[in-house]
């Protein structure tokens, strides 16, 4: 473990690249996790879930004139 940490901290360029790579990977995983949670939490409120209800009755509207 110490040798891996030593190799990462040996040069500043490797250290910075490791930080940027880790941040990039974390951002991707975090984005996917939050989107999945958001869609599960708002299941009946999202457009993709209620679109059928609104488009289904679109041509059936009657004019009272």
Curated annotation (Swiss-Prot):
Question: Any phenotype upon disruption?
Answer: Leads to decreased vegetative growth on several carbon sources such as citrate.
The GO annotation for biological process reads: mitochondrial electron transport, ubiquinol to cytochrome c; mitochondrial respiratory chain complex III assembly
Q: One MF term in GO for this entry? A: ubiquinol-cytochrome-c reductase activity
**Any stretches that span the bilayer, and where are they?**
14-34
Query: What Pfam families would the database entry show?
Result: UCR_UQCRX_QCR9 (PF05365)
- Which InterPro entries does the entry mention? QCR9 (IPR008027), QCR9_sf (IPR036656)
The terms describing its cellular component in GO are: mitochondrial inner membrane; plasma membrane; respiratory chain complex III
The UniProt record lists the keyword tRNA processing: no
User: Mitochondrion: present as a keyword of the record?
Assistant: yes
What keywords is this UniProt entry annotated with? Electron transport, Membrane, Mitochondrion, Mitochondrion inner membrane, Respiratory chain, Transmembrane, Transmembrane helix, Transport
Q: What is its main location?
A: membrane
- State the superkingdom: Eukaryota
Question: Which family does the record claim for this protein?
Answer: Belongs to the UQCR10/QCR9 family.
Protein name in the entry: Cytochrome b-c1 complex subunit 9, mitochondrial
Provenance organism = Candida albicans (strain SC5314 / ATCC MYA-2876)
């Amino acid at each position: 473990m110490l040798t891996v940490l030593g190799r990462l901290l040996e040069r500043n360029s490797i250290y910075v690249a490791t930080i940027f790579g880790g941040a990039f990977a974390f951002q991707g995983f975090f984005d996917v996790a939050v989107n999945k949670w958001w869609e599960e939490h708002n299941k009946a409120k999202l457009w993709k879930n209620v679109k059928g209800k609104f488009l289904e009755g679109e041509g059936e509207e009657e004019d009272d004139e």
